[in-house]
């Protein structure tokens, strides 16, 4: 199941973008549990402690039974010509074995860039293109294939969390 909803205001998104980020070239996990540069992912990312923004996000995520955030999350930055090819966030068992859901929040105003759509395929290969509204959250199973299309112009920022079952209240059915 894929859930989408606007959960942050324009001002809240800008607050996250304006944090003191140290952007570095994004890396991907390898089968050997290493993080390596790859031609499949050309964006930049800043790893931040989730506690920096948990007070802002958690109250808005409770209805999805999310009761905590992982220790770290990342802010991804895509500029012209950058993308992330089709992949799964639950790729390697030795690295991602606990990833359950992926949560991505669109931080940029969609007028600030062209291209860069987030495309997700469900188990039946049906395609969903994420809403690009500023503050839009998309929550999906980490095993689903997805990609960030190439940015044609401008800059796109997103906030990314990899959730485990530990982050969910489990006395209710999970989404």
Walk through the language-model features, giving the residues of each.
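Non-heme Fe(II)/2-oxoglutarate
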Residues: 1-68, 72-74, 83
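Catalytic core of non-heme Fe(II) oxygenases with the double-stranded beta-helix
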Residues: 55-175
């Amino acid at each position: 199941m894929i859930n989408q909803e606007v959960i942050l205001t324009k001002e809240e998104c800008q607050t996250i973008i304006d944090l003191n980020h140290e952007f570095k070239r994004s890396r991907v996990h390898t089968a050997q549990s290493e993080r390596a540069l790859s031609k499949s992912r050309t964006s930049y990312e800043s790893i931040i402690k989730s506690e920096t923004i948990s007070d802002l996000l958690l109250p808005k995520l409770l209805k999805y039974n999310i009761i905590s955030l992982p220790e770290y999350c990342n802010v991804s930055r895509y500029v012209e010509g950058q993308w992330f090819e089709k992949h799964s966030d639950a790729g390697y068992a030795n690295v991602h074995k606990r990833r359950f859901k992926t949560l991505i929040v669109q931080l940029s105003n969609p007028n600030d860039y062209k291209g860069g759509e987030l495309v997700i395929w469900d188990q039946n290969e049906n395609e969903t293109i994420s809403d690009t509204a500023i503050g839009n959250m998309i929550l999906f199973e980490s095993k689903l294939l997805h990609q960030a299309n190439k940015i044609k112009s401008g800059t796109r920022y997103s906030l990314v969390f990899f959730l485990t079952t530990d982050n969910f209240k489990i006395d209710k059915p999970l989404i």
